[in-house]
Amino acid sequence: MRLTSQVLSDAPTIINPEKQVTLSLRSLKIPYLENLGITKDTYEVIDLTDNELIELSNFPRLKNLKVLLVGNNNITGINDDKLPNNLPHLQSISFIHNNISKFSDVRILCRFKNLSNITFIENPITDSPNYRYFIVWLIPTLKVLDFSKVKQKELVKAKELFGESIDDPSELALSMLEDISTTESRKNQISSKDIRNLQDVGKKLTDEDKAKLLQELETADSVEDIERIERALHNGHM
């Protein structure tokens, strides 16, 4: 389904427990983003969970947007150099259950000045050696990665491995930013989110548990609930 002006007008608006105005665009099979300018920068949260997005791009300038939920899509990276300027106050992104496999495809995240919370759980990129250290180094404003707080010792280790900053990278950092997939993702590139859901979630949960969690995810109306359910799916227990 295309993200038409009519679809946007008909989409439900939710006030979540954090008192944030949320635009719910879940489970609409949206293949790419368009027409978001008609929202007139009304929303603090945009929920695009469970669609068919391949890349994160084509956002207009939305100064009020703080949280972006794009879990359970087919996103392989961010292909929009204007995104950091267009979303200047973005604080949190959930990429859970996508197809991101190359650090070069998320390098632009270092330019988000207020990004403090990000999730890459169930993406091929997490199989890379030193993944957590690298993301912590790449995004110096980060406070929480994959539901775990960033520790001071991680920041120290990250600089030892990759250099003082993205402006002064080590050879290891440069090699990880090359346009190549991680070893694991080259062997096992996953293109279907349905296959990912069956393989990654089904093997950890009973059918009854899985059905219950997915039903809860469909009706969740707050960032807190969404993260709780996604964490349960990732950990394999209720």
Swiss-Prot record:
Entries under Pfam families matching the protein: LRR_9
CC terms in the record's Gene Ontology section: post-mRNA release spliceosomal complex; U2 snRNP
Domain LRRCT: 123-161
Renumbered ranges of LRR repeats: 19-40, 42-63, 64-84, 89-110
Keyword entries, A-Z: Leucine-rich repeat, mRNA processing, mRNA splicing, Nucleus, Repeat, Spliceosome
Quaternary structure and interacting proteins, as annotated: Associated with the spliceosome.
Family, as annotated: Belongs to the U2 small nuclear ribonucleoprotein A family.
Protein name: U2 small nuclear ribonucleoprotein A'
